[in-house]
Amino acid sequence: MANHIYLAGDSTVQTYGDSTNQGGWGQFLGSHLPEHIQVINRAIGGRSSKTFVEEGRLQAILDVIEPDDWLFVQMGHNDASKNKPERYTEPYTTYKQYLKQYIAGAREKGAHPLLITPVARFHYENGVFLNDFPDYCIAMKQTAAEENVQLIDLMEKSLAFFTEKGEEKVYTYFMISEGINDYTHFTKKGANEMAKLVAKGIKELGLPLTESIIKER
């Protein structure tokens, strides 16, 4: 049975300290899982599927990941940065190619890869929250199907959750509520809500992470 979940991701996933109210869902995921599951959060801001590999961050995970561990991958926000070519990947070519490196690397170590679509931003029209990364979500789903990999559609889950809660409530989930011109990053409150959605996705997939006792918080 898996005891570790390694997280590869960006600033919406990474762990932040107590000096800021900013949070990433990766720092809260463990509190919604059985106590024997250890979440090791290697997500870091500003990285795309490409730069996370190029900087050796994927390899650093693969050096320590063990058989039957899990590698959760949420990438896409920074992949979409056309104005930053060092980060940018094209959804249906290079993005998919890089995702497949994570998948192959995990499997070579006897671990289980899982893909997570990019989480939604604070962007809505007429009360409905919008997907800012549609091509990356489609490309990730294609990759999951092609490689027979489990996927949690966090974009879909977060959009539905935000639309249900409404703009005023969701406003408090994002750093824009802290007086910062930031429609992407979460407050700790918002990050914890996203962690709940990921935990729900784990349960829905019936993953061998003792889903029957995932905490309902």
Curated annotation (Swiss-Prot):
The active site is at 11 (nucleophile), 178, 185. It comes from the Bacteria. It is an enzyme of class 3 (hydrolase). Induction: Up-regulated by growth on type I rhamnogalacturonan. Keywords: Hydrolase. Gene3D superfamilies: SGNH hydrolase. One of its GO terms (molecular function) is hydrolase activity, acting on ester bonds. Its EC number is 3.1.1.-. Belongs to the 'GDSL' lipolytic enzyme family. May play a role in the degradation of rhamnogalacturonan derived from plant cell walls. Probably has broad substrate specificity and may degrade several types of acetylated substrates. This is Probable rhamnogalacturonan acetylesterase YesY.
